[in-house]
């Protein structure tokens, strides 16, 4: 018998227009080349060899090209897209966070299969650190970061880069399926409380209970207005020689008025107090009547009276 696998790298297999093969995976930092490929770490896409593109072009693969990655040793799986086909044969390059989700080490085997995923309508994320709350607009930051992703899988911990800092988010829920495509989709995003977040404790003021309740019935009289209750001041700044000691005010000395319970809105009533006239005032008015020519005349030059 002859073995048809005479090459070091596995040959892709086709089952009913489905791409399926195994690659040895490495992190993007081990990708040889003059250009810095740190942009691959910021997304959810992998780099595959040119032979994969040749096989995919012969199949009736719907775009965008989405793949299911499976680590059979740990029974872990995730989904991703493809960025380029420039890797060496038999090798694929993955972002570091994706290798952590799959529990893969450098050079580990991963099963790659082409899949079709439904378009996402809802997703829920849980930040893995309370530092994520320092971001002013987290939804806008996440929307910008997800442009480098092709799909989401429930249970994955994705990594996004913002202001030169890496934030990890766990995908708690996706709809309509556990794995969804987020390319050209209208998706509602929600956040769960960050891992390790504690709500600030409210300071409750414990008031000491008294043996008996205080009687506040006498306070109403003290709150009434009392005219000229202050102390006077002189212009020269001196104080009076004898200052009378103010007598304490009792609640009964100041009486409050009784409200008019028959008051009607929009009606004004002028209340006047009737006071009896004093008899002395009447006598003064009677005695002080006007009498014409009752005074004495005066002249500028004194003249003697004729005998």
Swiss-Prot record:
Essential component of the ubiquitin-dependent proteolytic pathway which degrades ubiquitin fusion proteins. The ternary complex containing UFD1, VCP and NPLOC4 binds ubiquitinated proteins and is necessary for the export of misfolded proteins from the ER to the cytoplasm, where they are degraded by the proteasome. The NPLOC4-UFD1-VCP complex regulates spindle disassembly at the end of mitosis and is necessary for the formation of a closed nuclear envelope. It may be involved in the development of some ectoderm-derived structures. This is Ubiquitin recognition factor in ER-associated degradation protein 1. Pathway: Protein degradation; proteasomal ubiquitin-dependent pathway. GO terms for cellular component: cytosol; nucleoplasm; nucleus; UFD1-NPL4 complex; VCP-NPL4-UFD1 AAA ATPase complex. Found in adult heart, skeletal muscle and pancreas, and in fetal liver and kidney. It holds the Pfam family UFD1_N2. Heterodimer with NPLOC4, this heterodimer binds VCP and inhibits Golgi membrane fusion. Interacts with USP13. Interacts with ZFAND2B; probably through VCP. Belongs to the UFD1 family. PANTHER family: UBIQUITIN FUSION DEGRADATON PROTEIN 1, UBIQUITIN RECOGNITION FACTOR IN ER-ASSOCIATED DEGRADATION PROTEIN 1. Gene3D superfamilies: 3.10.330.10, Ubiquitin fusion degradation protein UFD1, N-terminal domain. The gene is UFD1. The lineage of its organism: Eukaryota, Metazoa, Chordata, Craniata, Vertebrata. Residues 231-256, 288-307 are annotated as: Disordered. One of its GO terms (molecular function) is polyubiquitin modification-dependent protein binding.
